[in-house]
Amino acid sequence: MSTINYDLTKIKSFIFDVDGVLSPDCIPLSVEGVPMRMVNIKDGYALNLACKSGYGLAIITGGDTDAVRLRFARLGIEHIYMRSSVKINDLNDYMNKTGYKPEEILYSGDDLPDFHVMQAVGLSVAPADAAPEIKNIAKYISHKKGGEGVARDVIEQVMKAQGTWMNDKAFGW
């Protein structure tokens, strides 16, 4: 695991894109043409633990499927922005609603629609297989590819740095 070169004690909120970050960058389609997503169980556990431990969490994605909304809502994520055509607008809405400052936010994105959000937050994270333009501006490039544990990688590092990883909420769903 590589280490993040940022003061992780500042992070109070995690925001993730879905396609290419929390799910692989390939999307299988049902016979009806409905996109389906695969998600990483360890990412889910880390997201849930972060929620239970008091961190702010949000999803900002261009996609819009009930399965994605339901999955992340069940993990405890309240702020889910679907069909986000201009992601920086949703980041600003999230900050206005929650009061988080840019330097308190970690955002992970993988492609050009994430560019402006990644420039606006304190800690920008890219999966190992992100677009070159995104890797160029990311403050941390995970050793994990999209859908293979990016969220777990960064949440675990932040929570360990803050002494909240192995807390009493860590031993159950």
What are these regions (language model features)?
Residues 9-27, 118, 151:
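Asp-based phosphoryl-transfer active-site loop
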Residues 47-71, 81-82:
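Substrate-recognition element of Asp-dependent hydrolases with the DxDx(T/V) motif
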Residues 36, 79-80, 88-173:
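Mg2+-dependent phosphoryl-transfer enzymes with acidic/Ser/Thr/Gly-rich catalytic loops
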Residues 10-12, 55, 103-104:
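Short coil/turn segments at beta-strand junctions that form active-site/ligand-binding loops
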Residues 1-18, 161-173:
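Non-catalytic pre-domain segments flanking phosphatase-related domains
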Residues 18, 62-63, 84, 128-130:
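Short secondary-structure boundary segments
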Residues 22-53, 62:
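A positional/architectural concept
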